[in-house]
């Protein structure tokens, strides 16, 4: 690893493979899946891959790193439905957040990281400031 971006240093806590249990507002059952976080060679980006065992929850890949211009970090997100989104992202004091402001479909997510597990809550607002839970996912580090 060479010259890892110091802004990404807190993401070291996520590196590894995680088993997931997700509950989506449109699906009655708990959906099993998995996720991996890994460094892209060079240490300037973190790559996230997720898989879910239900057709309504897409598989996805994301890349976390500095934006082309501006400050902070972004998550470039792509999924099996053909959806592509850009989120702002942060991981400070063990709390990971990502969000995007898109009129009619604002999104935000947060998780308080533990060493071996965490719950990630995804919310959306189709009307400004009227947030509703969209997805809750428990992540457990695979041994």
Annotate each predicted stretch with a short phrase.
Residues 1-143:
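Hydrophobic small-molecule pocket/channel-lining residues, especially in calycin-type beta-barrels
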């Amino acid at each position: 690893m060479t010259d890892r971006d110091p802004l990404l240093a807190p993401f070291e806590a996520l590196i590894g493979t995680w088993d997931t249990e997700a509950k989506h507002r449109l699906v009655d059952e708990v959906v099993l899946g998995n996720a991996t976080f890994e460094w892209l060679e060079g240490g300037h980006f973190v790559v996230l891959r997720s898989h879910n065992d239900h057709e309504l929850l897409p598989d996805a890949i994301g890349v976390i790193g500095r934006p082309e211009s501006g400050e902070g970090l972004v998550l470039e997100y792509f999924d099996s439905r053909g959806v592509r989104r850009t989120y702002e992202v942060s991981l400070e004091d063990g709390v990971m957040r990502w969000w995007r402001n898109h009129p009619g479909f604002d999104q935000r997510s947060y998780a308080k990281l533990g060493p071996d597990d965490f719950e990630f809550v995804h919310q959306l607002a189709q009307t400004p400031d009227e947030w509703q839970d969209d997805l809750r996912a428990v992540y457990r580090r695979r041994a």
